[in-house]
Amino acid sequence: MLTNRQLLILQVIINDFIKSAQPVGSRTLSKKDEITFSSATIRNEMADLEELGFIEKTHSSSGRVPSEKGYRYYVDHLLSPVKLTKSDLDQIHSIFKEKIFELEKTVQKSAQILSDLTNYTSIVLGPKLSENYLKQIQIIPIQPDMAVAILVTNTGHVENKTINFPTKMDLSDIEKLVNILNDRLSGVPMDELNERIFKEVVMYLRQHIKNYDNILDALRSTFHSTNHVEKLFFGGKINMLNQPEFHDITRVRSLLSLIEKEQDVLKLVQSPHTGISIKIGKENDYEEMENCSLITASYSVDQKQIGSIAIIGPTRMNYSRVVSLLQHVTSDLSKALTSLYDE
């Protein structure tokens, strides 16, 4: 159990190191307004904190820096969100000012603004397409036996699919097909489209379209491949280059390489928990992330978690500011999505 004096010194060391990226010595601490102890007392308390594993010495300086244990204690016991500025809030609110809400544009804009506001890398995990429902479908012929199906969901997501017909299709049949699909599938969840086609749509195709069985096979392969996995949106992928810890090109290269691996990124940012989650250094289970911290926050629709937002920064990241930003963005995004899904 740390004493109040040790808690204060640890907090001041971490706050100063977050701002300066420079090891903190007893002389620096003695100049802080909140530190009223003698230099000898400060040195003794720092020695105790080092022995307890909360701070550590660097090779290049006589000062001390926080250890992972120190950051963890800080995050768990000393962290308090900061009040965001009007400029911060204006930028966040700008994400949701568009009259026509399009999910992908909004999510991408969220990622970009978060990276701009933090100067770190942001990753937004979008909702699974299967959690949307079909709003409209268009089919545009591009060759006699080929067309592009444009699927629009209730969230504004647009997906293009190529349909390969076994034989040449008449334009009148394509028009009938579009009318049938929109009439029978509008409002159907995306992951149920294939099932509905073979249970309900098939009888209408049989009645109105010649060679309907060929069309059925083409639709089967088209809708079977509809993407049901989450999409990742990035902001500020190279922002880490601005951090002193990542002036080592080898370290930067390994981190950027990890970020390019979609499955690894999904494992990093998918969170089974609601609210804010903070992983520091080696807690991330990836060697490339041992000098980084990852803060994730979930967003939801009607209390159901459907996606998450993550910020990757150095272990020296400004935790208080990032947590405050994530809380505001996820809250606004959840409200916007709940309104959209309830339409």
From Swiss-Prot:
Q: Report the record's Gene Ontology biological process terms.
A: negative regulation of DNA-templated transcription
For this protein, the record's Gene3D superfamilies field holds: 3.30.450.40, Heat-inducible transcription repressor hrca homolog, domain 3, Winged helix-like DNA-binding domain superfamily/Winged helix DNA-binding domain
Q: Which GO terms describe its molecular function?
A: DNA binding
Q: Record's SUPFAM superfamilies?
A: GAF domain-like (SSF55781), Winged helix' DNA-binding domain (SSF46785)
- The source's superkingdom equals Bacteria
- Keywords for this protein: Repressor, Stress response, Transcription, Transcription regulation
Question: Which InterPro entries would you find in this protein's record?
Answer: GAF-like_dom_sf, HrcA, HrcA_C, WH-like_DNA-bd_sf, WH_DNA-bd_sf, WHTH_transcript_rep_HrcA_IDD
Instruction: Describe the task this protein carries out.
Output: Negative regulator of class I heat shock genes (grpE-dnaK-dnaJ and groELS operons). Prevents heat-shock induction of these operons.
Say which family it is in: Belongs to the HrcA family.
The record's section on HAMAP family has:
HrcA
Q: Can you say what this protein is called?
A: Heat-inducible transcription repressor HrcA
Organism of provenance: Bacillus subtilis (strain 168)
